[in-house]
């Protein structure tokens, strides 16, 4: 019987070998090509600037008229661009709103994230209240937009509220509870303490007209 010549196996790492592997079917190659094509390209500087202009205009419109009362045409007009140009960056009003709310939630959570367990309780709580008041003063449109979203049932950020916001509040509530157990602050429900701070500080932005009407323009 004639002896069979030994079969030389090519390394799987070889590009030529991978192209001829049985697993590299046309369907799989097409799937890889589709996945590569679906990967978003990085935005250019001009594209990022355009998006920022649109988001700033949308913040102005949404905070003034709410989601339902706002239109793409209004946002385009405030942004100073045509409606087709705006739709190139954001095909739907919902996409603009969700993007705004996602970025807003990050900003809104930042003051609470700074509360440290190893800090002095009174200093930490006072600092948190001060930061929240500064946000109400410096970002009133964002605060009103967030309040409007809550009144609508938070359809665009409910997942972030139930995960990111809840996790952060749970963490800080535990810090407050520890301080209470150590006798450093009076005992109360830590969650309702946080809620009370939210209500007090955000009132100045969410009810700006009421505050100014009662206090007068000079004090409001």
Language model: regions and residue ranges:
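Hydrophobic alpha-helical segments that form the core
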Residues: 1-3, 7-10, 186-209
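Amphipathic alpha-helical segments used for helix-helix packing
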Residues: 124, 137-159, 207-216
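Generic hydrophobic, amphipathic alpha-helix propensity
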Residues: 50-58, 75, 100-104, 108, ...
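N-terminal intrinsically disordered/low-complexity leader segments
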Residues: 1-49
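Hydrophobic alpha-helical connector segments
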Residues: 113-144, 187-197
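Helix-turn-helix
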Residues: 53, 61-95, 99
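Amphipathic alpha-helical packing segments from all-alpha helical-bundle domains
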Residues: 106-113, 138, 155-182, 191-192, ...
């Amino acid at each position: 019987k004639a002896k069979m010549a030994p079969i030389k196996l090519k390394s799987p790492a070889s590009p030529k070998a991978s192209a001829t592997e049985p697993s590299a079917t046309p369907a799989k190659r097409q799937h890889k090509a589709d996945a590569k094509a679906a990967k978003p390209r990085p935005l250019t500087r001009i594209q990022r600037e355009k998006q920022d202009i649109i988001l700033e205009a949308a913040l102005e419109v949404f905070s003034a008229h709410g989601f339902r009362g706002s239109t793409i045409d209004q946002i385009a007009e405030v942004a100073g661009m045509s409606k087709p140009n705006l739709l190139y960056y954001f095909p739907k009003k919902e996409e603009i709103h969700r993007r705004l709310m996602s970025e807003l939630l990050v900003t809104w959570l930042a003051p609470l994230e700074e509360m440290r367990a190893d800090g002095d309780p009174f200093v930490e709580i006072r600092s948190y209240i001060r930061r929240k008041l500064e946000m109400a003063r410096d970002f009133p449109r964002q605060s009103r937009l967030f309040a409007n979203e809550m009144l609508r049932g938070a359809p665009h950020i409910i997942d972030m509220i139930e995960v990111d916001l809840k996790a952060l509040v749970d963490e800080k509530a535990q810090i407050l509870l520890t301080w209470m157990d150590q006798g450093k602050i009076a005992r109360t429900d830590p969650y309702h303490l946080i809620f009370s701070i939210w209500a007090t500080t955000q009132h100045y932005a969410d009810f700006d007209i009421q505050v100014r009407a009662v206090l007068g323009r000079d004090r409001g």
